[in-house]
Amino acid sequence: YVDGTIWFHGASVGEILSIIPIIKRFEKDSKIKKILITSSTTSSSQILSKYKFKKTIHQFYPFDLNIFTKLFIHYWKPRLAIFVDSEIWPNMYNNLYKRKIPLILLNARITKKTFNRWKYFPNFSKNIFEKISVALPQNKESKKYLKLLGTKNIKIAGNIKFYGAALSNYNISSLK
């Protein structure tokens, strides 16, 4: 990951605040040269700007259209993508997979209601969820649903909003 960017994506303020301890740790890691954080809200961008990180930059998440996600990946060249909570984006996942960029779903959350929606499209769902390299769900329920939807590598990490940064001690080098 020396030459590449570590990319985090969270929808808004809550997800971004939950990864601040991880960002702080990665900021201190000399092997990590650039950290990209994307979100969909201006408020999360404003909060990030208050931290004055040196290696971390914020961009807004692109529309999940095939051409936009391809261009985004080509421009930023992430070595690792970490999506927070329930951020499931089919085109982005597919293009990360095609480029052999590992994808972690951190603090993964799938409710019964969400699961029931995904199971109406079993082939489509499997095609998306099997592209997750590692899922770190909040609880056993989310683990069960992720497995049923096609995710293979799942380890319960708890809710990082309450228990701290599970990923900060996770061996990301094993995903190379």
Predicted regions and their residues:
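Active-site and donor-binding regions of nucleotide-sugar-utilizing enzymes
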Residues: 2-171, 175
